[in-house]
Amino acid sequence: MVKRLLSLALVLCAALGLSACKPEENDKAASNNSGTEIRLLSGSENKSIEPILQEAARQAGATLKVTYKGSVDIMLELEKGKSSEYDAVMPADRMWITLGDKTRAVKNIASIYRSPVVFGVKRSVAEKLGWTKNEVKVADILKAAQDGKLRFMMTSATQSNSGAAAYFGFLYAFAGNPEVLSESDLDKPQVGDKVKTILGSVNRTAGSSGWLKDLFLDRYDYFDAMVNYESMIIETNQALVQQGREPLYAVYPVDGLAIADAPLGLVAKGDPAKDAAFAKIQDYLLSAPVQNQLLNQGRRTGLGVNASGANQTVFNPALGIDINKVLTPITMPAPEVIEKALTLYQTAFRKPSLTVFVLDFSGSMAGSAEEELKNAMRVMLDQSLAKRYMLQASPKDVFIVVPFDSQTRWVKKVEGNDQNKLMELWQAVAREKANNGTDIYSPVIAALPEIRKYNYENYSTSVILMTDGKSEGSFDNLKQSLAAQALTGMPVYSIMFGAADPSQLNAIAVFTTGKVFNGSKDLISAFREAKGYN
């Protein structure tokens, strides 16, 4: 009953196949070993422990090549079974293996470490709320957010394992903590109402736990807390202490705690050399010295979730990380309940999204690039395609599309999730033809009056800007327009393609707390990933 919780994440990405769970493709080759190569598909949560993974491969006489992707993409890759290009997999949670590995190709699965999903709250805020002395329930968190006493960040439940884990914790708490969550629990009006309220209180969302941590550090003064892995809160606090800033106090909701189990499994293809190398790598990671090393990096190890004996400069009780307290995680429900819960999150419970797609149809986009762009937008708008990646629209979502070249061509929008209206919008995009030059700034400015027609705080609002060339126009004009419309906190997520200038897009990302995605290899995947951030 205890550990099925983590499986949850798996479902999430599975349905989604999307960005949040999406690939941050950072392939890294290992040492100088000339032995068997193991290709590992891993969640981005493991980036900080890659040196340990590489040492495990070295000790096994193997070469390790790691590719980092999101939970959904890991799940989708595992659907390929033995046809996958990877030899091993290490997602954030076993759930992703359960949901994706339909042919049971993944063998010898073992948890390498565990990390609870917690609320990291600035200590002074936690003290004012009475959370440093008393147990905290999900209802307490909801009340603090409703009262305007807690501005917090959280990843999407259909894009990121940490967001999914927190979401299931909310569901359990508001359903009265059943032994196992059921479909009938999801149908209870009071459950839906309370979940909608707490998700509507999220002040900023993202598609990646690691990126959420980085954003919190970058915009520290704007937020009071974030939902993330305990290990990420520990890493955040280490950075905050170095910066001379107030650290976060870890809050473990007593009625809605989820724990991720970081499983490592072999994609069994009948290759004796790879099987043997994998076994040595896994044995090394599970050895006592290495488990202690992981513990000292903020990961709970051992058969349970007990971190007794941990370094208290890492597991700091003064910051709420109580290594002696027994943690009681929720039990993951049946797969069909997980799937229904994630669908409800996307289509009914989450904070509505307002997404502006700013699309480059300059002359250099002619040919295959133009077709890729149109195909990507079909995935965004056609609900029959969006469903596979858990990107379905909700009845309150808003879509605004702005095609451009050297000037803005038009601005059109659709409110809600009516399939016919969304397909009409896609058909308008499909009729566009590439021509003329490139100005990425003026079309974003042209969309701002439409955005301001809506209550900004009631939506997860963002711009997704796709371009393939160096822009004319003025970045200063864009900055001034964002300031004039009080939209400087609205993220612009750029998708870089072709000859786009990274310096121009990075400048926009820094100014708006956005991010740049590389669409050169797979434009559809880049759009999926960017959409997963709102």
List PLM regions with ranges.
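N-terminal segment of the mature folded domain
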Residues: 24-159
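VWA/integrin I-like adhesion module and closely mimicked acidic/polar interface patches used
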Residues: 245, 467-518, 528-530
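Acidic, polar low-complexity linker/tail segments
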Residues: 23-26, 303-356, 363-371
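Von Willebrand factor
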Residues: 350-415, 420-466, 494-504, 525-526
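Periplasmic-binding protein-like
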Residues: 111-119, 192-199, 206, 243-270, ...
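Ligand-binding pocket segment of bilobal, Venus flytrap-like solute-binding proteins
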Residues: 178-252
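C-terminal motif of bacterial Sec signal peptides marking the signal peptidase cleavage site
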Residues: 17-20
